[in-house]
């Protein structure tokens, strides 16, 4: 439904393993000779999904907070979290938020005078956070915010 491309068997394994400890999950997947990468995703889904549900169940989060919680473990853990508990935030993540992209890039920041440094990534991350939260609505607003962030640095 969300176009994640996750093989159905991987989610099925996560469901079967949902009551196991992380060590039990890894041992079980090794006995089944599941490829390491798939096994890591299944184990992460089993261990992270309940925490993700708990995190999203607290105070209302901004869209960027939802993305920050879900992205590192996507798509398996957020999808499995939805199977555990229907969360509107995760529905929004899969239908809209995970596809939010900036219209500016590091090259644009260089044209604004920012040299190569870790600051480029930090500014791009802040711009995406603002865009996710609805504070930026296109290339011009992204460039204006980038100028502001560069001058404040």
Task: Give short role names for the model-derived ranges.
Residues 1-86:
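Conserved, hydrophobic alpha-helical core segments of structured domains
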Residues 63, 75-153:
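Charged substrate- and nucleic-acid-binding regions of tRNA-handling and nucleotidyl-transfer enzymes
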